[in-house]
Amino acid sequence: MNVLVIGAGLAGSEAAWQVAQAGLPVTLVEMRPLRRSPAHHSSEFGELVCSNSFGALSSDRAAGLLQEELRRLGSLVISTADHHAVPAGGALAVDRGRYSAALTEALDAHPLVTIERREQQRLPEPGQITVLATGPLTSEPLAEDLRAFTGREDCHFFDAASPIVEGESINLEVAFRASRYDKGDADYINCPMNQEQYLAFREALLTAEQAELKDFEKDSATFFEGCLPIEELARRGEDTMRYGPLKPIGLWDQRWGDVTDRDVRRAKRAYAVVQLRQEDKDGRLWNLVGFQTNLKWGEQKRVLQLIPGLENASFVRFGVMHRNTFLEAPQLLQPTLQFRQRPSLLAAGQITGTEGYAAAVAGGWLAGTNAARIARGDAPIDLPATTMAGALTHFISEAPSGKFQPMPPNFGLLPELPERIRDKRRRYGAYRDRALADLAPFSSAPKVAEATAAAL
């Protein structure tokens, strides 16, 4: 059976290659150059539209570990990136032109790959095994058909993500666990502010430097009204945040005293409260509720560390606001990247809610591998959650209910180690060793390349 792959970006290119390498014919559909997205400039496959870097090369870094896993899994994209790497001070960066040309040439030369330059405007019929890898700028006709297939509430068309911090970096001598009015469990971490702290925080927001929207994103600026950036709330008035995401009502730290004592309550209650909500099953990652923002990343760190309890916060993702088509993956996808309602349809890349080049490649590898397995009548696979690639796919398919937001590779996604290791470098090295050992049954490379070994 011929497998269809829609989109020849990082994920689609990898998916098509894995299908072909499994000995099955695959049709790779790419609308460029007949129709270009606002962000693309060439008709080559796997075009890198933002940075030319795949992230840190060292395998004791999250991005580097994911790259090494992909090397071991026989990734075409990572192999091509390695061959066209440029000096980048410990990161895997590439010569964009040579890299994309080589990737395109490899796929074009494969005898089992048929390339069709056309726009796919509808999802194929249910009997067709398909990998959907159309990326964050999916064309409107296909996006509309995807909306109809998933339900509008399950397909987002503007990404407004709040920052995420590591739970262990939150100062719980200042912050406290509680839910508003003590309803349910103490599901939130709360960072209280007095009036002076709140006003200083607001002033920092008002003066912080914002990221510039791209031209094609400015047309979508009206979408912000439904999820206003925190700096816009600050601009709307001194108390706007306090009556919005920073409202303190119903939140009390038991260390402050007896909440039923009116005098204690008046003396101790917070002027404003920043809430953090659990992002993963194990409570190791926490997002700042209502803190979608368009501030530059360096400014975010500076301003958000003014929040009491977050003075030393370690950020695994900064807030972003940009156009980004992505699925409500926990409701729609299995860890195999198959759609729950149509197992012959798989998704890969940024459209699934992963962030970063290497994460897109990992999704392409798994979706392509499983498309080939389904076509042969074999059961699909999912990678161990102890690997970075597996942790990402398990996260997007199993994230807690609520507002799902894209996630980059990070060690906070991995299950805890059997024994706690306080030194971060040694801990990340242990995560790496476990991940690569657990990946061994799926991989073909015998050992870690010297270039990706941890710097000692």
Curated annotation (Swiss-Prot):
The keyword NADP appears for this protein: yes
Keyword flag rRNA-binding: no
Record key words, sorted: Cytoplasm, FAD, Flavoprotein, Methyltransferase, NAD, NADP, Transferase, tRNA processing
Cellular component terms (Gene Ontology): cytosol
Binding-site residues for FAD, renumbered to this chain: G7, A8, G9, L10, A11, G12
InterPro entries for the chain: FAD/NAD-bd_sf, MnmG-rel, MnmG_N, TrmFO
Any Gene Ontology biological process: tRNA methylation
A Pfam short name: GIDA
Subcellular location: Cytoplasm
Catalysis: reaction(s): uridine(54) in tRNA + (6R)-5,10-methylene-5,6,7,8-tetrahydrofolate + NADH + H(+) = 5-methyluridine(54) in tRNA + (6S)-5,6,7,8-tetrahydrofolate + NAD(+); uridine(54) in tRNA + (6R)-5,10-methylene-5,6,7,8-tetrahydrofolate + NADPH + H(+) = 5-methyluridine(54) in tRNA + (6S)-5,6,7,8-tetrahydrofolate + NADP(+)
GO MF annotations in UniProt: flavin adenine dinucleotide binding; tRNA (uracil(54)-C5)-methyltransferase activity, 5,10-methylenetetrahydrofolate-dependent
EC numbers, comma separated: 2.1.1.74
Enzyme class at the top of the EC tree: transferase
Role summary: Catalyzes the folate-dependent formation of 5-methyl-uridine at position 54 (M-5-U54) in all tRNAs.
Protein name: Methylenetetrahydrofolate--tRNA-(uracil-5-)-methyltransferase TrmFO
This protein's encoding gene: trmFO
